[in-house]
Amino acid sequence: MAKKSAIEKNNRRKALAARYAAKRAQLKAAAMDENLSLEERFKARLKLAELPRNSAPNRVRNRCEITGRPRAFYRKLKMSRIALREYGSRGQVPGLVKSSW
């Protein structure tokens, strides 16, 4: 089980990323728009830099929904390899059969 503080920090990052997503997209579009003057584009970049760092979506870490483990994460199932193996052995993952020989 991961530290609760790390899981909560990641949840805060998810919330911040969702809250600032529209504003960030608007500023990025303005910064990349070649029809605007260089000065306006630069202002958009400065505004983008003023946003909280944790509002960037790439700072959000994929974590297992069950254990909170940050590594060996299966996106499709939203769980780590360890949780997947455990749940698969119990037959709780539809379509998954754990092989044994």
Curated annotation (Swiss-Prot):
Cysteine pairs bridged by disulfides in the record: none
Keywords: Ribonucleoprotein, Ribosomal protein, RNA-binding, rRNA-binding
Gene Ontology MF: a single term: structural constituent of ribosome
GO BP, one annotated term: translation
PROSITE patterns found in the cross-reference section: RIBOSOMAL_S14 (PS00527)
InterPro entries in alphabetical order: Ribosomal_uS14 (IPR001209), Ribosomal_uS14_bac/plastid (IPR023036), Ribosomal_uS14_CS (IPR018271)
Gene3D superfamilies membership: 1.10.287.1480
Entry GO terms, CC: cytoplasm; small ribosomal subunit
Domain of life: Bacteria
Pfam families reported for this sequence: Ribosomal_S14 (PF00253)
Subunit structure of this chain's protein: Part of the 30S ribosomal subunit. Contacts proteins S3 and S10.
Family according to the record: Belongs to the universal ribosomal protein uS14 family.
Function: Binds 16S rRNA, required for the assembly of 30S particles and may also be responsible for determining the conformation of the 16S rRNA at the A site.
NCBIfam families from the UniProt entry: PRK08881.1
Protein name, as recorded: Small ribosomal subunit protein uS14
Annotated gene: rpsN
